[in-house]
């Protein structure tokens, strides 16, 4: 398994767009230039590990998802766990 800078950039772009953010807004929130963000999203360059951690936190995704495309959104996982927990509690009450 290798790091694909273009795929990572595409995931960042997708997350930004899903959240209705412009490159300028996201860049400002991350305290980087929009040119730097554009280069990351296009796969011209990779982000630093510190920036990737900040992006993962910002978008509530795992670093594993952001870098390698594995896993998913952490908030979706939490929602699924809560649904399962509620189902188990309901079953326990029925017993």
State where each predicted segment sits.
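Residue-level detection of the helix-turn-helix DNA-binding "recognition helix"
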Residues: 17, 31, 42-44, 71
């Amino acid at each position: 398994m290798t790091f694909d800078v273009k795929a990572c950039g595409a995931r960042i772009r997708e997350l930004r767009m899903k959240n209705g953010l412009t490159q300028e807004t996201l860049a400002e929130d991350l305290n980087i230039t929009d040119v730097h963000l554009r280069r990351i999203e296009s796969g011209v360059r990779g982000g630093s590990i510190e920036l990737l951690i900040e992006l993962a936190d910002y978008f509530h995704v795992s670093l594993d998802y952001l870098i390698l495309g594995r896993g998913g959104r952490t908030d979706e996982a939490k929602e699924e766990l809560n649904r399962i927990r509620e189902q188990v509690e309901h079953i326990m009450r029925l017993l």
